[in-house]
Amino acid sequence: MFFLTVGSPGLRLAPQATSTEVMGFIHLFGDKRMPIWGILALLSNLLLVLFSGSRHRTFYLLSLSMLILFVVIYDRLSKPINRLQTAAARTGRRLDNAGALQASWDRSLMMRVPLLAVSMLAQFIALFCSASAVFE
């Protein structure tokens, strides 16, 4: 959320070559380090779907579905842009369509963020309902 609200608008003020280089190096590390957290989120939600009580299983299934959709959108829309920016940053090459690529990446982010929000909200509702049942 930090980068969406602060980093991205700040980078828009920088020259396109600088923006491409910075985003390329961010993706160089992010694309290697972030998948483990996504895998753990998917796995934990899958386990909750399989082993939770039937009352809350729907919320966990909704959460898992949102995460799967998030990964599909990332893989189809964001990852190819990440690769282009990373390759450009590594080689010092300038991308003629850098602004359009970043705008496309930002649009894909605006699709993915609500999916994460719905996933977290579904988990919260399931947890809240479970906690409420304990205290009744």
PLM features per residue range, with description:
Residues 36-48, 64, 112-121:
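Core segments of transmembrane alpha-helices
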Residues 71-77:
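Mid-bilayer segments of alpha-helical transmembrane spans in multi-pass integral membrane proteins
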